[in-house]
Structures are given as C-alpha cells and as structure tokens.
Amino acid sequence: MAPFPEEVDVFTAPHWRMKQLVGLYCDKLSKTNFSNNNDFRALLQSLYATFKEFKMHEQIENEYIIGLLQQRSQTIYNVHSDNKLSEMLSLFEKGLKNVKNEYEQLNYAKQLKERLEAFTRDFLPHMKEEEEVFQPMLMEYFTYEELKDIKKKVIAQHCSQKDTAELLRGLSLWNHAEERQKFFKYSVDEKSDKEAEVSEHSTGITHLPPEVMLSIFSYLNPQELCRCSQVSMKWSQLTKTGSLWKHLYPVHWARGDWYSGPATELDTEPDDEWVKNRKDESRAFHEWDEDADIDESEESAEESIAISIAQMEKRLLHGLIHNVLPYVGTSVKTLVLAYSSAVSSKMVRQILELCPNLEHLDLTQTDISDSAFDSWSWLGCCQSLRHLDLSGCEKITDVALEKISRALGILTSHQSGFLKTSTSKITSTAWKNKDITMQSTKQYACLHDLTNKGIGEEIDNEHPWTKPVSSENFTSPYVWMLDAEDLADIEDTVEWRHRNVESLCVMETASNFSCSTSGCFSKDIVGLRTSVCWQQHCASPAFAYCGHSFCCTGTALRTMSSLPESSAMCRKAARTRLPRGKDLIYFGSEKSDQETGRVLLFLSLSGCYQITDHGLRVLTLGGGLPYLEHLNLSGCLTITGAGLQDLVSACPSLNDEYFYYCDNINGPHADTASGCQNLQCGFRACCRSGE
C-alpha cells in the first residue's frame, strides 16, 4: 500500500514516538539489575513516565481522531477501551510503594516482565491497525483540508506536553534566579500540599523523560553532575548512571580541571615544572601535622596551597570511593591517578575492586605498593585492561605483576572448548598450565562425593620456572559447577558439606597431561564468589599456549602473524569438546573469535627497579600478551636478557619503536629497540643516575 500524503497522515508521526518509547523500555528492561534497589526504582519511574505518555497519546487520539470518526461512521467502536494502560500504571505504582527488599524485587520483576511482554504484543499491532484501517477511513469520510486541520491539532496537542520549544524555554527559565528561588522556597510539607497544582501548570525541565535528561547530563562535568544530584531524588538517581562516569581523573579534578572524556596523549610526559609541583604537594601533605597550630607550623603560602590541594584530592577520592563507584564502578573504563599526592594503596585497592571493567589505568609516580592490587588476586577479574602505566611506582615488585597477570585472565582458544581445573592449594603464586580431558566413565558427581575423595595432591611451587610438572603426582581434580541463576551466599557454603545442594555439582577430570619441557603452568582456579569480578569473569577460558622460549625451542614467536597451535610446543592430552549447557562452563562460545582476556596494549614499568626476571615471566602465563605494542622497562635494573627474551617471545605484536629497556642489558632486538627513557631523569630510577 502506498503511503498516505504526509500532510494528512495523522498517525505515523505520533506512532513513531510511541514505538521509540517501546524500544527504550524493552532495552532498559533487559539491562536492569533487579537485585539493585536503585536500578529497580529507576526502571519503574521510567516506565511510569512512559506509560503516562502512552495514556496521554491515546486520550488525544480519542478526542481528535476516533471521536470525530465516530460522528461520521456508526461502525467505529471505542478502540482504546481495552488497552490496559491504567492497569500497567497501577502495577508500577504498586512496585514503587510496596516492594521493600531484594526478594520482593525479584518476584515483582518476573510479573513485570510478563505483563510488559503481553502489553507490547497488543500495543504494536494496535498502532499498525490504526495506520492501516483507520487512516483509509479518515481519507474516505473527511476532506483533504479537514484532515490537514486534524493532523495539525493532533501534533499540537502532543507538543503541548513534550514540545521541544517549551522544554528549551524551561531550561532557559531554570537558569534565572527568580525561577530558582521559586523552586526552592517551599518546604517539604508545602511542596507535598501543592504538588498537584504545580505539576498541572509546570512544563519545565522536571517533566523531561529520563532518556532526555541523561542526554543533557552527558554534557556536564563531574562537578556539575554532583550539584544536579542534590536537586531531587530523581536527578540523584539519574546522575548515578554509569554512562556518565566512564572516565575518571581525580587528580586533575582536584586542581580545577574537570575534563572527563577519553584518555588522550597517552605517551606524553608532563613537563618538569608540573612534576615538581606535584612532588612539592605530596611532600607538604605528608609532612603536614594535622594537630599543629598555625603559629607552630610557620608554613609558607605556597606550602599552604599545596596542602589544601592535596587535602581536596584526598576528600575527592574518598567521595568517589564511598558515594559514586558503588553505583557506577562497573561502567568505569578510564582511571588516571598519575602524580597523585594523596592516593594510597588502600584507596587504589578499593577502587580496583569496584571497577572490574577498567580499560585504562594510570598510576604514574604514585606511592603505591603491591597491596594496591590485592583485589586483583582472582583470575580474569580485570581482563578488559588495555593500558597500564606504573611508571615511577618504586615499591612495585614481582608480587604485583603476579596479581596483574592473573587479573588479565587466560587467552581464549579459537578452536575448542576447555574446562577449568582447580587444586587444593589456593594460595599458590605460580600457574601450572595443563589442559584437561573429560573422563568418559564418570562425568558428574554429587556434592557429597567431594567430601569422600581428595581434591588432589599439593603441587610443589618452590621453583616453578625451572622444575617441570609431572602428571604422575597429580590426581584428578574436581571442577565446581554453579547455577548462575541460583547463586548462594558465601556464608551459606559453610553448611554445604552437611546437606545436598541440587544446583551444585562437581565434575571430575582426567589427570594424564604434561608438558614436554619446563615452563608450562596453570593457576589454581577457585570457586565462584559473590564479588563483581567473579560474577563477570569467573568463566575465563583455558590457556591457548604457554608462550615461553622454554617450550618454543628458539622459535621467534613475536615475528609470527598468528599464535601457533599448542600441539607445536607441548605434548598435551587430546581435548574433549563439552556439550553446551547452562550448568557447564563452556568456552567454545559464539564470541570465541574475539579475545576477552589478555588484551593489554600498553605496559610501562619505567623506574620499577625492584622488578626481576620472575615478574617478567609471570606476564607470559595464560597465553602471554599477544596484543602488547608498547613496553617500557626503563630503570628496571635487576632484569636480565634472558628474562626479557622470555617476555618478548610471548608478545608477538610488540613494536620495537615502543620497546624500552636499559642500555646495559644485552637483550632481544638490541639494534632496533628504543633503549632507556630514564637517562638523566631526575625522578625515575636509572642505572646512570648522576652521570
């Protein structure tokens, strides 16, 4: 059917808006975490506003279209009598008023999804019927000029509620002191008494739908967002939307620079004056005595300013950790704390635990230690990380690199599914790389079998880089399978051995696997936990290959365009494909062509002089760093050429132009690498300092 002339098509334009709203609430419904009270209430408030607009739309159609058509045709009935909009609005009000805890939220969510799906199934065909049935009838019973007039009135009525010009006028009025005074002058009690009257006459910014408000908020900086969060409860919830807090720069914010876009100029070092000012601030802050009197301290004006800035930075960091990141942490992609005067290892540890999806982390020249990465002690808990800068972090040792490598996860296999193994030694610091095969005689065991059989003998990790692993001393491990839809509380697991849990099974795996040489290890994998990191990344895939020069027999891995097959390096047992199933951890997923772990592109350990060869080799575990292009090891005084060679062999994408290490080390690609960057540097470790 040919489309009707735009001038007399009374349904298409309003229906476009209604269909857009349907798409928006379907998308929000699929992304809402119903266990989170803030997400739950934000969804209901958005749905309530959406369905109020649906009701307004149908009231306009009844008055200006259907009502007129009924006057000229006796065959037209009340087409909006069974739309159930009032029932849906009552459902949302009930959820906002009566649902009090997580259990009730989850039960309500099931009912909500069913009701929304039923409504959507009816609402979309209803609009199609109006366009295909009633529009031709309008063309039959009304003249061209009459239809033009009807459409003009319909559009005008819709715009009287959500007209862009009116909204812009509301935004303009919002900036006037007179309107602000009018908004704030009423007390809470007076507001509640006059709420109905105000809502009837107001068409300002408070009536904007949430998606429009989020679009407006996206243009604001963090300081402005914090101010907006104090306007109302609705705005407070909207300003805690994750998309508004993707990039964090607390150090710059504390100094008045409120930039919050993507990280830029990644390789550019600040000038000497900027670094000196940051060091002066840090020194003044750490030497400052909080109990000292003004007369006693006798600080200069410059020192007072430095202390004030450092104090501001500390307060800002505490505010982020306690008031912002618990809500938006999973959405944070960039965190830059370079040259921070006040950040501590504890703060970094808390931030990293709340931000499992970080892609860019810059801790340049901060006073952190290995403990800052304690929250990264779990396999794959930050496997999206692409940029890590620890330049000048002099307290960092191999321990931190072990945690970092573990957090990057395990390289995904592109050809077959793998099953993760675990042993009883959870505190092990080395990874033992072993592929596993399924036993065909016994695949599943109930929970009580776990208490009757040993998990496996403890594997010696004292010399993990020189001692080959023998399969003779390794018994069959168990892999715990948890139903992701029925996770138990961690405290409940204490009683698991005393009762039967139907949703938990253990899978027994074979133990006849070994590597032809030393250097292939895998990390103990512990069970699922309630942490955000575990819930998102516990299903990291198995090793794709070891990536060490020990097992590569001199092969120049970094010159290859693709990663070699594991069979080319190690004699391993044949892998057994696992069937797809919701109770199995299956790694041959639909997204197997895209790596989900070990995607690091940039790594700088410049000035981390306590790093040794062991730390470099730890980075080669789990498949190495196949995407790494930039590696800065300037000032790492104790590493050797052998350790560098082992790391380089696991970094096939490394660019010599961005490969830096000490000039005194006879390492790989000595003729093409860029050498040391810390020569004559006043604030980074270097073997030639003082020359």
Swiss-Prot record:
Its pathway? Protein modification; protein ubiquitination
GO molecular function list:
2 iron, 2 sulfur cluster binding; iron ion binding; ubiquitin-protein transferase activity
Q: Which cofactor does it need?
A: [2Fe-2S] cluster
Provide the residue positions that the database annotates as binding [2Fe-2S] cluster: 662, 676, 686-687
Q: What is the effect of changing residue 57 to A?
A: Abolishes iron-binding and promotes its degradation
Q: Would the keyword rRNA-binding turn up in this protein's UniProt record?
A: no
All residue ranges annotated as the F-box domain in the record: 202-248
Please name the InterPro entries in this protein's record: F-box-like_dom_sf, F-box_dom, Hemerythrin-like, Hr_FBXL5, Leu-rich_rpt, Leu-rich_rpt_Cys-con_subtyp, LRR_dom_sf
Q: How is it modified post-translationally?
A: Polybiquitinated upon iron and oxygen depletion, leading to its degradation by the proteasome. Ubiquitination is regulated by the hemerythrin-like region that acts as an oxygen and iron sensor. Undergoes constitutive ubiquitin-dependent degradation at the steady state by HERC2.
Q: How does it assemble?
A: Part of a SCF (SKP1-cullin-F-box) protein ligase complex. Interacts with ACO1/IRP1, IREB2/IRP2; the interaction depends on the [2Fe-2S] cluster. Interacts with DCTN1/p150-glued.
Note on file?
Answer: Binds a diiron center, that can be bridged by a hydroxo group. The hydroxo bridge is not present when FBXL5 is in the reduced form and seems to play a critical role in regulating iron binding.
What's this protein's function?
A: Component of some SCF (SKP1-cullin-F-box) protein ligase complex that plays a central role in iron homeostasis by promoting the ubiquitination and subsequent degradation of IREB2/IRP2. The C-terminal domain of FBXL5 contains a redox-sensitive [2Fe-2S] cluster that, upon oxidation, promotes binding to IRP2 to effect its oxygen-dependent degradation.
Q: What is this protein called?
A: F-box/LRR-repeat protein 5
In which organism is this protein found? Homo sapiens (Human)
Give the gene symbol: FBXL5
